């Protein structure tokens, strides 16, 4: 009886102890939650600060980039205007040369008509005395000389026009390259090197046949102007004797390249050119790479052509692109 009363007397203090523990646990949970929220808020504030800092840096960088791009654009526009002015001036010069060529053609036509008339007069006068015949013969010789002079002037004008067209094409390529355009497009089976394309022909040909073969391919026999170009050719001729575009057909000893330029760089074989046996007026490049004058009617198994490389041109520039000059005819 007393034990039961004792046990019932201490029961309430145990319940109060449990309530105190639960309160402490709840307080710890609340403090932990508060600490977690405070940490999360601190992380959010740090992220916001870093993001704002990065956005500011990006904005400053963008402003600098826009400023640089604006300056570059202004410089490009200024250069473009200057280049357009040069192209217009060269086009005007080309038109003037074309007009002069037309005038020379008209003069040549008149000279031909005059010559025809005079030849008819000479035929009618052949029955006259020998003195008149001699005078007429002299007159005929004079007229032939006049016609020859007219043809020479016409050819000189034509050569000048071809050179100008090629210079315009080269200048246009330089303009495109300065704008970042790639000028390295070559026809199939041609090799590119330093803004030109090269074709290494095979088959037995005389020099004149090799020249015509290059012309049929819209090119001409190669003109060599530097040691680098010589080295490039040596890598591809496979040690075969090859025709190149050098000759002195017009005047012995005065060699001229197929592009009309005189000889600057040379790689003659020792003792060459020697015109051995007389009539060695065309130049070949031996398998060793050294040059030798040879008979133009000799047959070689290889020959080298060249032409200017073309450029990758965007649509706005394509409308003003000059045409490639036709290969210059050789004497």
Swiss-Prot record:
It is a single-pass type II membrane protein; Lipid-anchor. One of its GO terms (biological process) is Fc-gamma receptor signaling pathway involved in phagocytosis. It comes from the Eukaryota. Sequence repeats lie at residues 71-91, 92-112, 113-133. Residues 50-331 are extracellular. Residues 185-298 form the C-type lectin domain. InterPro entries: C-type_lectin-like (IPR001304), C-type_lectin-like/link_sf (IPR016186), C-type_lectin/snaclec_domain (IPR050111), C-type_lectin_CS (IPR018378), CD209-like_CTLD (IPR033989), CTDL_fold (IPR016187). Residues 1-23 are cytoplasmic. Pfam families: Lectin_C (PF00059). The keyword Lipoprotein applies. A lipid is attached at residues 17-18 (S-palmitoyl cysteine). CDD domains: CLECT_DC-SIGN_like (cd03590). One of its GO terms (cellular component) is external side of plasma membrane. Coiled coil: none annotated. The keyword Transmembrane helix applies. Ca(2+) binds at residues 272, 292-293. Keywords: Calcium, Cell membrane, Disulfide bond, Glycoprotein, IgE-binding protein, Lectin, Lipoprotein, Membrane, Metal-binding, Palmitate, Proteoglycan, Receptor, Repeat, Secreted, Signal-anchor, Transmembrane, Transmembrane helix. It is found in: Cell membrane; Secreted. The chain crosses the membrane at residues 24-49. N- and O-glycosylated. Glycans are attached at residues 65, 114, 319. There are two kinds of Fc receptors for IgE, which differ in both structure and function: high affinity receptors on basophils and mast cells and low affinity receptors on lymphocytes and monocytes. Homotrimer. Interacts (via C-type lectin domain) with IGHE (via CH3 region); this interaction regulates IgE homeostasis. Interacts (via C-terminus) with CR2/CD21 (via Sushi domain 1 and 2). Low-affinity receptor for immunoglobulin E (IgE) and CR2/CD21. Has essential roles in the regulation of IgE production and in the differentiation of B cells. On B cells, initiates IgE-dependent antigen uptake and presentation to T cells. On macrophages, upon IgE binding and antigen cross-linking induces intracellular killing of parasites through activation of L-Arginine-nitric oxide pathway. This is Low affinity immunoglobulin epsilon Fc receptor. It comes from Mus musculus. The gene is Fcer2.
């Amino acid at each position: 009886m007393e034990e039961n009363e004792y046990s019932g007397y201490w029961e309430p203090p145990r319940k109060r102890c449990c309530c105190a523990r639960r309160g402490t646990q709840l307080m710890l949970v609340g403090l932990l939650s508060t600490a977690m929220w405070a940490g999360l808020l601190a992380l959010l504030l740090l992220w916001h600060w870093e993001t704002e800092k990065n956005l500011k840096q990006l904005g400053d960088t963008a402003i600098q980039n826009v400023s640089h791009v604006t300056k570059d654009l202004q410089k490009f526009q200024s250069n473009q205007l200057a280049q357009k002015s040069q192209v217009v001036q060269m086009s005007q010069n080309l038109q003037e040369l074309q007009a002069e060529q037309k005038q020379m053609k008209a003069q040549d036509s008149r000279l031909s008509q005059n010559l025809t008339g005079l030849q008819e007069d000479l035929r009618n006068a052949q029955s006259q005395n020998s003195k008149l015949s001699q005078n007429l013969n002299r007159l005929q010789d004079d007229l032939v000389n006049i016609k020859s002079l007219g043809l020479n002037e016409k050819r000189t004008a034509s050569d000048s026009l071809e050179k100008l067209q090629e210079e315009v094409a080269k200048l246009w390529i330089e303009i495109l390259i300065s704008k970042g355009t790639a000028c390295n497009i070559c026809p199939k089976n041609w090799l590119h090197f330093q803004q030109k394309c090269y074709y290494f022909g095979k088959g037995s040909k005389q020099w004149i046949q090799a020249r015509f073969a290059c012309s049929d391919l819209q090119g001409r026999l190669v003109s060599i102007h530097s040691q680098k170009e010589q080295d490039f050719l040596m890598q591809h001729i496979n040690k075969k004797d090859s025709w190149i575009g050098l000759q002195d057909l017009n005047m012995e000893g005065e060699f001229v390249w197929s592009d009309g330029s005189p000889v600057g760089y040379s790689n003659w074989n020792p003792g060459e050119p020697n015109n051995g046996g007389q009539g060695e007026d065309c130049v070949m490049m031996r398998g060793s790479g050294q040059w030798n004058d040879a008979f133009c009617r000799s047959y070689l198994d290889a020959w080298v052509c060249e032409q200017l490389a073309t450029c990758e041109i965007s649509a706005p520039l394509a409308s003003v692109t000059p045409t490639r000059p036709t290969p210059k005819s050789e004497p």
